[in-house]
């Protein structure tokens, strides 16, 4: 026989494997039995334990009693080192995280070209988080219109505003605008405009704000940018449903373990029976051969 397995959720102590433990049946006293059931199921576990009625086959191991054993003074199991399936893990500032989602900076691409008549053009990437501009060689994607601005710092600010506008209203039509970019501030941009006009105080440029990535909106949680995987929950799954599923899975695993041990025991018993039958057949054959030898 495989022995008894502890019926406490998350505990898989077995009387056949754990020889040093004691296993106790639920008491017959209604009040004491109710206390046992309440403690074992951790305040009403959903799933199988929501309608759990213990029988003689359900045992609680001595690990859940103070001192490691049930006694006259210690009659109720109170030690549960493993977290129950209905016990929520406290998460630090979980409410704060939901109210203020931590977005990654969305990158908006700025296409800087010369005014009509100029052939040079550059593509810059403007990051909303740090307002950094880098040279890139990408193509134009989603468009977002911005107002006329003057100076490189104004371009950054207006572009960030355009990113927010694009996030709220979707992708708008791309528009070309003329700006005056201060050459004295273009050391971080490192443009390829090497005309004589670039040595002056300002340079006439044409800017098109385009974007490669959608900007996550505040009302979208979790963010659609997060890649899905096989263990992720759907948006409609509640914590209670997930806990119920986990509890059912644990009960199924515990049941499967018991069934596997029963099968192993049955296989062992069949092997012993097979050996006995072979021995009996051998003995019968021996008894048949003995009279024939004597007669000869």
From Swiss-Prot:
Q: Which residues form a coiled coil?
A: 240-281
Give the InterPro entries listed for this entry.
Answer: THAP_Znf
Q: Where are the zinc fingers (THAP-type)?
A: 6-64
> Which PROSITE patterns does the entry mention?
ZF_THAP
| Listed GO CC annotations | nucleus
Q: Where in the cell is it found?
A: Nucleus
| Pfam families xrefs | THAP (PF05485)
Alphabetically sorted, this entry's keywords are:
Coiled coil, DNA-binding, Metal-binding, Nucleus, Repressor, Transcription, Transcription regulation, Zinc, Zinc-finger
Q: Which GO terms describe its molecular function?
A: DNA binding; zinc ion binding
Write out the function statement from the record: Transcriptional repressor that plays a central role for embryogenesis and the pluripotency of embryonic stem (ES) cells. Sequence-specific DNA-binding factor that represses gene expression in pluripotent ES cells by directly binding to key genetic loci and recruiting epigenetic modifiers.
Q: Which family is this protein grouped under?
A: Belongs to the THAP11 family.
Q: What is this protein called?
A: THAP domain-containing protein 11
Taxonomic source organism: Xenopus tropicalis (Western clawed frog)
Q: Which taxonomic lineage is given here? A: Eukaryota, Metazoa, Chordata, Craniata, Vertebrata
């Amino acid at each position: 026989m495989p022995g008894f397995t502890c019926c406490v959720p998350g505990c898989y102590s077995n009387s056949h494997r754990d020889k040093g433990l004691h296993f106790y049946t639920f008491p017959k006293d209604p009040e004491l039995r109710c206390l046992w059931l309440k403690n074992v199921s951790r305040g009403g576990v959903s799933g199988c334990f929501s309608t759990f009625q213990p029988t003689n086959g359900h045992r609680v191991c001595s690990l859940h009693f103070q001192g490691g054993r049930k006694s006259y003074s210690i009659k109720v199991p109170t030690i549960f080192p493993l977290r129950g399936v209905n016990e929520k893990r406290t998460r630090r500032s979980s409410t704060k995280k939901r109210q203020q989602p931590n977005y990654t900076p969305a990158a908006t691409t700025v296409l800087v070209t010369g005014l009509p008549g100029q052939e040079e053009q550059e593509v810059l990437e403007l990051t909303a988080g740090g307002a950094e501009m880098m040279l890139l060689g990408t193509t134009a994607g989603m468009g977002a219109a911005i107002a006329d601005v003057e100076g490189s710092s104004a371009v950054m600010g207006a572009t960030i505003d355009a990113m927010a506008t694009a996030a709220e209203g979707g992708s708008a039509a791309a528009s070309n605008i003329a700006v005056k970019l201060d050459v004295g501030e273009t050391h971080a941009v490192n443009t390829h405009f090497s005309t004589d006009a670039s040595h002056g105080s300002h340079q006439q440029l044409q800017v098109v704000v385009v974007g490669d990535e959608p900007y996550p909106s505040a009302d979208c949680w979790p963010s659609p940018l997060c890649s899905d995987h096989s263990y992720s929950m759907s948006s409609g799954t509640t914590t209670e449903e997930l806990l119920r599923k986990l509890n059912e899975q644990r009960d199924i695993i515990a049941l499967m373990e018991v069934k596997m041990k029963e099968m192993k025991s049955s296989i062992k018993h069949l092997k012993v029976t097979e050996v006995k039958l072979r021995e009996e057949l051998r003995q019968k054959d021996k008894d048949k051969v003995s009279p024939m030898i004597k007669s000869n």
